[in-house]
A protein has these predicted regions:
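Catalytic His-Asp segment of secreted/periplasmic serine-dependent ester chemistry enzymes
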Residues: 35, 39-89
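Residue-identity detector for glutamine
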Residues: 17, 32, 80, 114-117
């Protein structure tokens, strides 16, 4: 709590913007209370808190495929959905422009192409782990 208060104070003192993000995670009641408390602190300080757990439908989440892997957090397939959602959210709410294909950003374009290839390989590995039930024993349940 003290670290968060210090960070919020630093941001305010230096007139800095920040977006606090909680990526989708499997949550028990105590964890949910903690994140709600953090969100309240962030909002009370005038900053935005994006809880992706509130956007399962918009993310297009498939709980059997996007969480199943090695724990109570998203796997590579779910992370790709989070990344796409977050990039759209930031572009829409913060006016950041898409620089793909523009001069001076060629290395970013190349990195993105490499990432897409690696994602396709990761999807195969994840699907295999799910099919073989070869992942952590953390229970994954759809929210009510």
């Amino acid at each position: 709590e003290e670290c968060l208060r210090n960070l919020l104070e630093y941001l305010k003192e230096n007139d800095l913007q920040a977006l606090f993000i909680l990526s989708p995670t499997v949550m028990e009641e105590e964890k949910q209370k903690m994140y709600n408390y953090i969100e309240d602190m962030v909002n009370a300080s005038g900053y935005e808190f994006l809880n992706m757990n509130d956007y399962y439908e918009e993310l297009g989440f498939d709980f059997a495929a996007d969480f199943s892997d090695y724990g109570g957090h998203v796997n590579g397939v779910g992370a790709q959905k989070c990344t796409a959602f977050l990039s759209s959210y930031i572009a829409k709410n913060y006016g950041l422009e898409d620089k793909r294909g523009e001069m001076g950003f060629e290395s970013w374009d190349a990195a993105y192409e490499q990432w897409k290839q690696e994602l396709e390989e990761a999807k195969k590995t994840i699907a295999k782990h799910i099919e073989e039930k070869d992942f952590a024993d953390a229970p994954v349940e759809e929210p009510e």
